[in-house]
Amino acid sequence: MKLHELHARSLESTLILADESLLRMRRLLREAGQEGIVRQVTNTMNEDARHDLIVAIDELARDFQSLAADFSLEQHDLDLRRVLDAELSSLWVDLQDCRPDRMKGYGQTFTPEAGALLENRIERLLARIEAIRTTLLKS
């Protein structure tokens, strides 16, 4: 069944988010956790439970695939460069929001030392992101 373009786009957006969530859950279950920069996902599950959840998630993924097929939503190819550029753009925006001047809205001000250090570190991270973007655009 074909949906109106606006409805199809909305459903497709939800399915993209669902797909990313399912991929992330599978990865966490297969790798039994994840160590990150400021948080760690610790495995507290036995192997059988993780296996059962992977099976259930795979079934859910098939249901999402069926939903997409029922409404004639097709898979689209995305250029890796565009995906990476979008990720870098998101990081850039998130870092801009971490600048001391932007965080004033929380009602607390930074000490001069902390504000200067944070601003300096944000600038360095943004420069690295721009360098990666330049490399990406040249590839």
Predicted regions and their residues:
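Long, low-complexity or tandemly repetitive, helically biased scaffold regions used
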Residues: 1-139
